[in-house]
Each structure stands twice: as structure tokens, then as C-alpha cells.
């Protein structure tokens, strides 16, 4: 009987990293307290590796103790001190997931925000081979910023994280992913002060894609749509005038592309009927692109077709 009880107690003490029910805490755990004291003693001797091992033992073997979130938080801090930010961020995340009632919960989220934003700006680095500090891997940065959003989706930090992510990806030429980040901000946080700029960034990225050689009709059309959305949502914003000018430029570009299509049908495909249809479309848009409309009318005259 005593053996069975002892075995049950041992099972209670020896837990894996499997998370306990969120908010579960054991009132007093003397073994956890002793391990915390041992960890602090190692810290006092500047044995950070040894201290981390003791703190890890607390969270692995005594996950229900009051000391578990303290150990988790301190372990994360020590990883930061050792220039191991990925390990630190992971420990903060586990604290957030497993100890939402801990007084350290908000501090952990705050540290994650600082780390994620610092990694995106390049201020936070990762130490390699014990001596070289290098920028964080883009995969880490992207995941971290999404964690910041997801951990507090209704806080102001969520749209901030998406804005930082969009800027980070755009600076690296990852246009599609950057647009997705900005779109997430605009769709889910329309009242954020960052939303107008994010909407304008979407339009700008599509326009840049068109200007950089990818004159795909879809990119130009999406840029036009993004500018229209911006002006519809924020007609009185400080940048509305510039957005209207950019929108007009996109409309002119679309008409110019229609003219190119008409020329292609006429000169390459030898399809006069299709060419005439396109020329008539362009000719009707003189208020948007006068030069293209004039060219289309001249072509229609050559083809002896009356413009609409």
C-alpha cells in the first residue's frame, strides 16, 4: 500500500514538458523552492549554464509549483544574457501559454515584443560560435511578430506587430508576404492609427512591382484598387492628395496597357476585329489618358472605323 502511494507521489513530481492546465498552481513545493535556491546560488557564482539547468528542472519536474513561472521567466532572462534569443523567446512563450495567471505574464509578453521588434530592426542579434553576432533569421523574426499579434490580438501591439512585419518583409523584397501583413492589419484593425499607412503601402507595393518591370495588368489593377480603397476609407487624410495623384497615374497606365494590347492584336496577331474593339475602348478614355486616346483614334481612322 505504501509503495503504491509513494509511486503515485513520484508520478506527481516527475512531470514532462507537457503543459499543465493553464493557471494550475500547487500551493507549496519544497523541492521546487530548494531548486530555485540552488539556481540563484549558481547565478551568484556566474554559472549561468548551471543556473539554467536548475531552473529547467523546476519547470520540467515541478510544473505546478508557484516557482515554475518564476523559473521559466528567469531562464528566459538568462538566455537573453547569453545572447541566445531564440531560446529566450521560446521560454517566454511557454510562460504565456502555461501560466496566464502569473504576475509575470504581461512582462513576458512585453519582453517578446521588445525582442521581436528589435530583431526586425536589426538591433537584436544572435551569437554564433560564441563570438560572432549576426542578425536574426528571417523565419524567426516572422514567427515572433506573429506570436506578438496572436498572444494579445485585441491589444495595440497586434497592429504594431503586423506593421513592423510588413515593413520588414517589404525591405527584403518579399512583396506578396508584405502585402499579406499589411492587409491583415487593415482588415482586422481598421481603426488603428497604423491602418491608413498600411493601406497606402499595399498600393505602393503593387505600383512598385509594375514599375520595376513586372508590368502585369493585374499588378496595375490591384494598385488602382488599393488606392481607391485608401481614398474611400481615408478621404481626408494628410496623404489623400498624393494618393489621388498616384491613382490617376495608375489609371493612365491601365489605358496605356490597353493600347499596347490593341497594337499587339493588330500587328502581331493580325486580328483586326479584336484590335478595333481595344482601340475603341482606349479612344473613349481621353479624360484619363489623352495621348493614348489620340493614338487609338488615329489607328481607328487608318482602319476606317469610327470611334465610339
What are these regions (language model features)?
Residues 11-308:
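Acidic, polar-rich low-complexity tracts and alpha-helical solenoid repeat scaffolds
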Amino acid at each position: 500500500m505504501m509503495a503504491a502511494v509513494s509511486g503515485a507521489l513520484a508520478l506527481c513530481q516527475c512531470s514532462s514538458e507537457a503543459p499543465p492546465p493553464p493557471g494550475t498552481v500547487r500551493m507549496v513545493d519544497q523541492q521546487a523552492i530548494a531548486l530555485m535556491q540552488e539556481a540563484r546560488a549558481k547565478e551568484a557564482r556566474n554559472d549561468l549554464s548551471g543556473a539554467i539547468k536548475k531552473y529547467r528542472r523546476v519547470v520540467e519536474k515541478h510544473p505546478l509549483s508557484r516557482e515554475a513561472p518564476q523559473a521559466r521567466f528567469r531562464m528566459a532572462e538568462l538566455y537573453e544574457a547569453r545572447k541566445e534569443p531564440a531560446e529566450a523567446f521560446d521560454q517566454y512563450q511557454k510562460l504565456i501559454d502555461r501560466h496566464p495567471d502569473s504576475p509575470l505574464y504581461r512582462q513576458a509578453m512585453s519582453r517578446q515584443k521588445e525582442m521581436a521588434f528589435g530583431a526586425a530592426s536589426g538591433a537584436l542579434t544572435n551569437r554564433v560560435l560564441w563570438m560572432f553576432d549576426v542578425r536574426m533569421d528571417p523565419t524567426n523574426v516572422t514567427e515572433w511578430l506573429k506570436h506578438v499579434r496572436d498572444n494579445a490580438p485585441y491589444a495595440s501591439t497586434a497592429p504594431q506587430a503586423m506593421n513592423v512585419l510588413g515593413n520588414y518583409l517589404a525591405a527584403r523584397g518579399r512583396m506578396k508576404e508584405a502585402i499579406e501583413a499589411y492587409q491583415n492589419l487593415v482588415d482586422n484593425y481598421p481603426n488603428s492609427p497604423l491602418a491608413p499607412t498600411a493601406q497606402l503601402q499595399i498600393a505602393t507595393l503593387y505600383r512598385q512591382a509594375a514599375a520595376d518591370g513586372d508590368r502585369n495588368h493585374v499588378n496595375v489593377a490591384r494598385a488602382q484598387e488599393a488606392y481607391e480603397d485608401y481614398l474611400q476609407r481615408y478621404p481626408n487624410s494628410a496623404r489623400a492628395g498624393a494618393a489621388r495623384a498616384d491613382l490617376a497615374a495608375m489609371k493612365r497606365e491601365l489605358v496605356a496597357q490597353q493600347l499596347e494590347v490593341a497594337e499587339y492584336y493588330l500587328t502581331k496577331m493580325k486580328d483586326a476585329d479584336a484590335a478595333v474593339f481595344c482601340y475603341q475602348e482606349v479612344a473613349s478614355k481621353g479624360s484619363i489618358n489623352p495621348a493614348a486616346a489620340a493614338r487609338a483614334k488615329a489607328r481607328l481612322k487608318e482602319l476606317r472605323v469610327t470611334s465610339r
